[in-house]
Amino acid sequence: MKLLAALLLVTGLTISPAQAALAAPDIPVANVQAHLNELQRIANANGGNRAHGRPGHKASVDYVKAKLDAAGYQTRIQTFTNSGATGYNLIADWPFGDASQVIMAGGHLDSVTRGPGINDNGSGSAGLLEVALTVARQNVRPAKHLRFGWWGAEELGLVGSTFYVNSLTSAQKSVIKAYVNFDMTGSPNPGYFVYSSSGQPSGSLAIEDLLEAGFAAKGVPTELTSVGGRSDHAAFARAGIPTGGTFSGAEVRKTAAQAQKWGGQANVAFDRCYHQACDTSGNINVTSLDRHTDVIAYALYSLIGA
Ligand code: DPN
Ligand code: CA
Ligand code: ZN
């Protein structure tokens, strides 16, 4: 418990959530799964995918946006053009907290054309959405300003996130104090990876430590991984913004030592359906989805000073 909350408790004062330091919430994984089922339904209704330039991507954006709008977020859709098609980033601001200290969290909402992209990256997208909705439900009044991004055209080379960062003035970049990325969190043969801060902007080590502490609080061992230019934090890192993230693994195979530590199958890919048609709502390990999503909440509540 944070000191303020403890003091108020012992002095017998009644306190509202807006005044107390909130413990990080336990995000109900069933709510995250419900979002994934919607993304699967959207893919089914739109030719089997949610890819850039295809109607399933825009329908995904509209689904997430409607939930956020109803919860009180200030949302906007930023458009860009790539490969002759319009792309979409969805940006959502929780309209409270010090605007000169912005904490950002994001992930990509587009899939590859081969399949519905439920683990890659419905999982991170749905987890971020449910954490955002939890902030609204709890009516959190954070010290810092919270902003979410759901990026388009990641699968074509980090296009949407790069477009967003390039669209910011240097003043707008300098107020962003952290960016945390969630791309693949429900891998069927899961790992519990935290992005390595090595080679990342100064300030990234604190984010790495925080994400590790979030898993440690749940008794889950972690490993560091160097994601490099393989996901959307890269554009933020290039702009000098401290970054981090979590990841449950893609095409690489789980080692025997990792299977000892995390369970699952040794010598099998973390996600055998990576970028395949079989990346459906059946391609999700619910325990992994639950743990990674709870860590999103743990890290964000701490970073924003909730
Ligand atoms: N960027 C992911 C993809 O969309 O294909 C895969 C990935 C995520 C790879 C994180 C490494 C680390
Ligand atoms: Ca949970
Ligand atoms: Zn991908």
Regions found by a protein language model. Name each.
Residues 1-21:
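Secretory targeting and sorting signals
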Residues 45-46, 74, 81-85, 96-99, ...:
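Solvent-exposed loop/turn segments at secondary-structure junctions
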Residues 22-55, 110, 184-187, 270-277:
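N-terminal capping segment at the start of a domain
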Residues 255-306:
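His/Asp/Glu-rich mid-to-C-terminal helical/loop segments that flank catalytic regions of hydrolases
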Residues 37, 41-95:
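A non-catalytic alpha/beta surface segment that caps or lines the substrate-entry region
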Residues 151-254:
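Metal-dependent peptidase/peptidase-like ectodomains
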Residues 96, 131-145, 169, 301-302, ...:
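Flexible, small-residue-rich helix->loop connector segments that border functional cores
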Residues 105, 109-158, 296:
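Alpha-helical metal-binding/catalytic segments enriched in His/Glu/Asp
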